[in-house]
């Protein structure tokens, strides 16, 4: 059993590395940001998605899912290289997820979204799971998780300073990379 878990863990790490996109290291900038929160709830009925926001950002609904997942992102106006926090609730503690800043437009023919950051660099992308070796964030029994990432504005073929991007939670390789929840984010001017 131990060998199969190790092999599965290695395969899972390889799948994660292949799934997440690479980019140039972010440029560090020190500037204060006013913190705000945004919430998007996604449920089985995609027309019931709602958003509460202290900014004027609009929201899009994700594909229908079984969970009622909420993401609270702070700050809402991201600065490349600074910390961003995802407070996530409604997750299945037995499930597996990724959290990252991603393109708001899906990749045609590919379930894996284009996200910012470097491949397998868990400073800009997180893997949430209680059962997978190598996961970077555990999910509490009540379905909550806190993810702290470095806000990264660019990825392969993605520039969130000029393209619409979202803070996204999506299923890991065991969940088919399905969309779970997302909330629009913007990067503050440098």
From Swiss-Prot:
Function (record text): Is necessary for biosynthesis of the 4-methyl-5-(beta-hydroxyethyl)thiazol component from which thiamine is formed.
GO biological process: thiamine biosynthetic process
Domain of life: Bacteria
Membrane-protein topology: Lipid-anchor
Protein name as it appears in the record: Thiamine biosynthesis protein X
Subcellular locations according to the entry: Cell membrane
Annotated InterPro entries: Neocarzinostatin-like
Residue ranges, annotated region (Disordered): 43-68
Compositional bias annotation for Low complexity: 47-63
Keyword Signal included in the entry's annotation: yes
UniProt keyword list: Cell membrane, Lipoprotein, Membrane, Palmitate, Signal, Thiamine biosynthesis
Matches recorded under PROSITE patterns: PROKAR_LIPOPROTEIN
Lipid-substituted positions (S-diacylglycerol cysteine): 23
Keyword Phosphoprotein appears in the UniProt entry: no
Main location: membrane
SUPFAM superfamilies attached to this UniProt entry: Actinoxanthin-like (SSF49319)
Gene Ontology CC, one term: plasma membrane
Signal peptide range: 1-22
Lipidation (N-palmitoyl cysteine): 23
């Amino acid at each position: 059993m131990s060998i199969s878990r190790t092999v599965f863990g290695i395969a899972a790490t390889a799948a994660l590395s292949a799934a997440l996109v690479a980019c140039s290291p972010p440029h560090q900038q020190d500037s204060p940001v006013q913190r705000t929160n945004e919430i998007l709830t996604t449920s089985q009925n995609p027309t019931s998605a709602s958003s509460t926001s202290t900014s004027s950002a609009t929201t899009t609904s994700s594909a229908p899912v079984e969970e009622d997942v909420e993401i609270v992102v702070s700050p809402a106006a991201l600065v490349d290289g600074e910390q961003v926090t995802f407070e996530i609730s409604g997750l299945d503690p037995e499930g597996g997820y990724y959290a990252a800043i991603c393109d708001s437009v899906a990749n045609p023919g590919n379930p894996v979204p284009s996200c910012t950051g470097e491949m397998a660099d868990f400073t800009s992308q997180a893997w949430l799971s209680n059962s997978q070796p190598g996961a970077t964030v555990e999910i509490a029994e009540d379905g909550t998780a806190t993810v702290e990432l470095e806000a990264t504005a660019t990825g392969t073929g993605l520039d969130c300073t000029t393209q619409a991007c979202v803070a996204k939670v999506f299923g890991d390789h065991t969940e088919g990379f399905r969309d779970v929840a997302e909330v629009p984010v913007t990067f503050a001017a440098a």
